[in-house]
Amino acid sequence: MKKVMGIINKKDGIMGGSYGGFMTSWIISHNPNTFKSAIVERALLNWETMVGTSDIGIGFPEMYLLDDMSKNINLYRKKSPMTYASNITTPTLIIHSQEDYRCPIEQAEQLFSNLKKRGVKTAMLRFPGESHELSRSGTPVHRKQRFDHVISWHKKHLV
């Protein structure tokens, strides 16, 4: 991964939202000590608990993973970043909106609890009244707060 992404040393940060948040958590759980800072936003982190709790529909995980959870629960677990969360050592900021029904907030709470319990540097921002679209169409005050925290987190851990 380091060669492909052009990462030479641990001076870089990583962040992503939605699928990018999924990938950020996947990358930091499979490549510990690669990044100095991470920000996971509005991410799907656990396929198993997302089924039936997301507004995207109960068929989405089956369509994406190409298998029925009741027939192959191990695939759902194998493809979930939460399965590998115990490998994460990167300081991680988690940003989630309380009214996010696409990737319900319990997804973020699972990751935050795991990291906090293990002593990983972490923080979680919860934005009341905001949806999955916070970074694009949230209230101006919340969008500014989010941006300020992103800058602050990376400054704290990258500088």
Region annotations inferred by a language model:
Residues 1-159:
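Active-site-proximal cap/loop segments of hydrolase catalytic domains
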